[in-house]
């Protein structure tokens, strides 16, 4: 099927220290207190996983699938149920991507990740239930610090929208979980989107919970997700809690 002239539902922004996908036409429906309810998630091994059994990382852009913690419903089904049942819901994904380098943007790892998320978003859009979820879904990823910054101490040329971070040598660390930089950018982007839409910004972002698999348990590779939730002062939930009904 031809898609010429068809606007993609999300716009991607690739910075040296951050990758984000924001809806082109975001939808905000406030609750009675003029608040948005934020449901936040990790991505890998929380919402999706590689198709290859027992694999930790995706081998290609299409090597992923939605997870099933419940035999009856996939993680995508649960995301759809959130936006179906909560009109004030906004879903945001925060993901550390230590294997992705965005300098240059044409790097193999960056291209693979961008294509992977594009396919992820396409899977949502192609589902008849996607029209509610897609305009309320935001995705943020923290890539790896490029070696050139570390070894040659070269100054990165930042786009105009983030020149204020030019002289911040810790910006790469600040956007990686458990630090809260990605959430800070999300707050800014929500406010900016409201201004573009000529909509009154929400009085408050009501963080319902943050869900991730890196909780410092015996078999977990990290505790970055649970520490991230603590720094945000947000309730933490394991994927098994959210996606098993």
From Swiss-Prot:
It comes from the Eukaryota. GO terms for molecular function: ATP-dependent polydeoxyribonucleotide 5'-hydroxyl-kinase activity; double-stranded DNA binding; polynucleotide 3'-phosphatase activity. Its main location: nucleus. It catalyses: a 3'end (2'-deoxyribonucleotide 3'-phosphate)-DNA + H2O = a 3'-end 2'-deoxyribonucleotide-DNA + phosphate. Pfam families: PNK3P (PF08645). Keywords: DNA damage, DNA repair, Hydrolase, Nucleus. The keyword Oxidoreductase does not apply. Its EC number is 3.1.3.32. One of its GO terms (cellular component) is nucleus. GO terms for biological process: DNA repair. It is found in: Nucleus. Dephosphorylate DNA's 3'-phosphate termini. Has a role in the repair of breaks in single-stranded DNA. Belongs to the DNA 3' phosphatase family. This is Polynucleotide 3'-phosphatase. It comes from Saccharomyces mikatae.
